[in-house]
């Protein structure tokens, strides 16, 4: 398989997003689809109120169009491709509903936690059912070894945890200009390398399509952001990277490659647990990126630092799987 397929997929995806954004952002402004800012959040965020959100629609359109066209053109379209697109679209639609409630009904929290969880769970259950019926393996691979353990139907529990947990973890990371776009590009880039190394060219194409789309989006989302991806983008990216981990049989490696997402989630869990048990907070605010804001770090410094940490995690993940 020619390596040009990777370059083509990334370039096409990047260009679609870059071309769509200048057209779509003014449209969102006319509809008054602006982001509401929580009053309890950092005061510096209040100036971001009204910034167009739901930019994740552009990311999704780019990913879908690029993946379908490139995989079909190079004859690598497979059942796995459809599963990836299903999860991405499914979680994207769920995020879209959440965003619509926020901007139309002016309810800043969007869907209730229960509603969102049920939606995430339904998509994950359908994914597992189709995954199982398509004959994909239910074995759990131990990274860096030749060991694997067939979990059978119990694999479904792991899969549900990964999809629901992954989408929420990535969603939590979307709190600063360019933070999620950059860390997502790095994480999907790592999985693209590993998928290509396995010969799963359709998964690799999907991953680089995501990389191209979020990098194109980053042009308009870097500080000061002209648009936010909203839950439309963040939930879709979270579900997608979990699905990629499942299809590449590198489920456990997601904890490493997605290390930034894990740390952000743990900071929230630690904060809530500490406050409930002791009445005291460990961090000034969670997720962790907000803690650094209140400590006095500039937004750009936090974002670049998290990108660097994400890159180290991604390199470690590739090293564990390929060279150990």
Curated annotation (Swiss-Prot):
KW Cell division (keyword) present: yes
Recorded catalytic activity of this chain's protein: UDP-N-acetyl-alpha-D-muramoyl-L-alanyl-gamma-D-glutamyl-meso-2,6-diaminopimeloyl-D-alanyl-D-alanine + di-trans,octa-cis-undecaprenyl phosphate = di-trans,octa-cis-undecaprenyl diphospho-N-acetyl-alpha-D-muramoyl-L-alanyl-D-glutamyl-meso-2,6-diaminopimeloyl-D-alanyl-D-alanine + UMP
Molecular function per GO: metal ion binding; phospho-N-acetylmuramoyl-pentapeptide-transferase activity; UDP-N-acetylmuramoyl-L-alanyl-D-glutamyl-meso-2,6-diaminopimelyl-D-alanyl-D-alanine:undecaprenyl-phosphate transferase activity
Membrane topology: Multi-pass membrane protein
Transmembrane intervals: 5-25, 52-72, 76-96, 117-137, 147-167, 176-196, 203-223, 227-247, 250-270, 302-322
Keyword check for Metal-binding: yes
InterPro entries: Glycosyl_transferase_4 (IPR000715), PNAcMuramoyl-5peptid_Trfase (IPR003524), PNAcMuramoyl-5peptid_Trfase_CS (IPR018480)
Subcellular localization(s) per the UniProt record: Cell membrane
Recorded superkingdom: Bacteria
Documented EC number(s): 2.7.8.13
Entry cofactors: Mg(2+)
Top enzyme category: transferase
Listed NCBIfam families: mraY
Job of this protein: Catalyzes the initial step of the lipid cycle reactions in the biosynthesis of the cell wall peptidoglycan: transfers peptidoglycan precursor phospho-MurNAc-pentapeptide from UDP-MurNAc-pentapeptide onto the lipid carrier undecaprenyl phosphate, yielding undecaprenyl-pyrophosphoryl-MurNAc-pentapeptide, known as lipid I.
UniProt-recorded name of the protein: Phospho-N-acetylmuramoyl-pentapeptide-transferase
Lineage, highest ranks first: Bacteria, Bacillati, Bacillota, Bacilli, Bacillales
Gene designation: mraY
């Amino acid at each position: 398989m020619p390596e040009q397929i990777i370059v083509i997929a990334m370039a096409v995806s990047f260009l679609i997003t870059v071309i769509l954004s200048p057209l779509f952002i003014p449209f969102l402004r006319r509809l008054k689809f602006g982001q509401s800012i929580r009053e309890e959040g950092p005061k510096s965020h209040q100036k971001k109120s009204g910034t167009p959100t739901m930019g994740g629609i552009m990311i999704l359109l780019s990913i879908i169009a690029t993946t379908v066209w490139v995989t079909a053109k190079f004859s690598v379209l497979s059942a796995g491709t459809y599963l990836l697109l299903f999860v991405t679209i499914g979680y994207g639609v769920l995020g879209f509903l959440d965003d619509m409630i926020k901007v139309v009904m002016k309810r800043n929290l969007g869907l209730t936690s229960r509603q969102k969880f049920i939606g995430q769970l339904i998509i994950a259950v359908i994914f597992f059912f189709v995954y199982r019926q398509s004959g994909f393996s239910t074995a759990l691979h131990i990274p860096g070894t030749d060991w694997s353990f067939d979990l059978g139907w119990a694999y479904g529990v792991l899969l549900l945890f990964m999809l629901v947990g992954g989408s929420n973890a990535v969603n939590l990371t979307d709190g600063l200009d360019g933070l999620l776009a950059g860390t997502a590009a790095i994480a999907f880039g790592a999985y693209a390398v590993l998928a290509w190394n396995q010969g799963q060219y359709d998964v690799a194409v999907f991953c680089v399509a995501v990389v191209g789309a979020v990098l194109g989006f980053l042009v308009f989302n870097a500080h000061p952001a002209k648009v936010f991806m909203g839950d439309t983008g963040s939930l879709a990216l979270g579900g997608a990277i979990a699905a990629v981990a499942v299809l590449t049989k590198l489920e456990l490696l997601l904890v490493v490659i997605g290390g930034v997402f894990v740390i952000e989630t743990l900071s929230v869990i630690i904060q809530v647990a500490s406050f409930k048990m002791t009445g005291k907070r460990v961090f000034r605010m969670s997720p962790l990126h907000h803690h650094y804001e209140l400590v006095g770090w500039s937004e750009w410094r936090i974002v670049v630092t998290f990108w660097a940490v994400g890159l180290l995690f991604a390199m470690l993940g590739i090293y564990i799987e390929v060279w150990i």
